[in-house]
Amino acid sequence: MSWLGKVLQKIKDDNKFMNMSYNETVLKDLLRIIPQKGKVEWIGIRSKKKEELSVVESVKVEKETGLEGDHFKGSSSGKRQVTLIQQEHLNAVSSILGKKRIDPKLTRRNIVVSGINLLSLKHHQFRIGDVTLETTGICTPCSLMEENLGAGGYNAMRGHGGITATVIEEGKIKLGDTIELI
């Protein structure tokens, strides 16, 4: 029996004593199965709103204020302390727009990762290097995408904007760090 078959059988057996339906439990457990580990490909910060992002190799991450040196540092809600986008989504957007490549600076996100579906981290905590983050929402595109990416940039980014996160445990994030569900 495959590992997934064993998991599903255990869930089915455990449900004999629970009020949850089999399908609800299976879905809940499937949402926790994220064996992929991603990798940090790019990091950018900006000290002022609408300023161009500065590319860095590493950044200190603080629990109360987010990324050191980023303009969202100390924002009131803390829900957008860190923004992340998938390299695979940048590739999709560049294809939609007929471009060879999109410079991550133009998307105004802090961290570009590859190898993991960021949307699968919704409602979960995850680790990048020694930093623990928690997803707080979907990062929707703003009107600057039209200016930064050209005609159709806003619509090309819809569904590909990444996620927002808050800091649970501080530390440092650097290029090449692993990103994984915890």
Model-predicted segments: where are they?
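Metal-cofactor-dependent catalytic cores
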Residues: 2-182
